[in-house]
Amino acid sequence: MANPLYHKHIISINDLSRDDLELVLATAAGLKANPQPELLKHKVIASCFFEASTRTRLSFETSMHRLGASVVGFADGSNTSLGKKGETLADTISVISTYVDAIVMRHPQEGARMASEFSGNVPVLNAGDGNQHPTQTLLDLFTIQETQGRLSNLSIAMVGDLKYGRTVHSLTQALAKFEGNRFYFIAPDALAMPAYILKMLEEKGIEYSSHGSIEEVVPELDILYMTRVQKERLDPSEYANVKAQFVLAADLAGAANLKVLHPLPRIDEIATDVDKTPHAYYFQQAGNGIFARSALALVVNADLAL
């Protein structure tokens, strides 16, 4: 059948149906098992990062090189015509689109406007905006499937900054496309999961609950998804309290299949001795970004009969 994602913008995880997600994940698994170094040969990809990034930018650029594509772009938007001369974002991206076959972009502006405001005919892949991080979600899903053998009938806890953490918003929306998943949200009141995410779960009849500590739910979990509590969002006294409340230690009493994930960077929320436990999987998770982002770049650039 024709590739449904060819030349499609991927701005939000909601741009992808369950079938689309399964297509990207199957492609990622194939690339991990059998690397294909020339699938995007002669393609040129723009890497446009208007915000700081380490893992996302480097894994995207590595992914492109491993598929045979050339990469152009920048890691500091302040040195572009947009930053120096006042050019609009729409004009900047419209011009770049005439040079390349696809654009990977991180920008604080929410992605729907980011894609719709430029006149170009190449796909835009959102590498993180003010609300969504779809490619992080793809590597998270790939990692969950790799460790659990499925994406349905899972018990998933999300811990830390659930209000501003774009990774947990996208991941919850994606996992809600698969049946039987159950969510546990663990966060201070000031950083609780946004109401629109909870409403979405309720409308779909998906079970969730809120909790004040990690320990009370660990025995139930397949996936424990940690995030950092962002110091800049809280009063100093409140931060000191919640920081100690949401620290994962190596003595967690989880099931044998439990995996601890984290979008990184971690600060203090996962003790370093957790790294040596069989539950820790966040560094492998980061490595899976190569395969998930390679797969996404491939399916939007190659009109394959998949």
Curated annotation (Swiss-Prot):
InterPro entries assigned to the protein according to its UniProt record, in alphabetical order: Asp/Orn_carbamoyltranf_P-bd, Asp/Orn_carbamoylTrfase, Asp/Orn_carbamoylTrfase_sf, Asp_carbamoyltransf, Asp_carbamoyltransf_Asp/Orn-bd
EC number(s) stated in the UniProt entry for this protein: 2.1.3.2
Alphabetically ordered keywords of this record: Pyrimidine biosynthesis, Transferase
Known catalytic reactions: carbamoyl phosphate + L-aspartate = N-carbamoyl-L-aspartate + phosphate + H(+)
Top enzyme category: transferase
Binding site for L-aspartate: 85, 166, 228
Pathway: Pyrimidine metabolism; UMP biosynthesis via de novo pathway; (S)-dihydroorotate from bicarbonate: step 2/3
Source superkingdom: Bacteria
Chain sites annotated for binding carbamoyl phosphate: 55-56, 106, 133, 136, 264-265
Any GO MF annotation of the entry: aspartate carbamoyltransferase activity
Record-level GO cellular component terms: cytosol
Biological process (GO), any one: amino acid metabolic process
Pfam families, sorted: OTCace, OTCace_N
SUPFAM superfamilies in alphabetical order: Aspartate/ornithine carbamoyltransferase (SSF53671)
Biological role stated in the UniProt entry: Catalyzes the condensation of carbamoyl phosphate and aspartate to form carbamoyl aspartate and inorganic phosphate, the committed step in the de novo pyrimidine nucleotide biosynthesis pathway.
Recorded family membership: Belongs to the aspartate/ornithine carbamoyltransferase superfamily. ATCase family.
Subunit structure: Heterododecamer (2C3:3R2) of six catalytic PyrB chains organized as two trimers (C3), and six regulatory PyrI chains organized as three dimers (R2).
Name of the protein in its database record: Aspartate carbamoyltransferase catalytic subunit
Upper classification of the organism: Bacteria, Pseudomonadati, Pseudomonadota, Gammaproteobacteria, Enterobacterales
Gene name of the record: pyrB
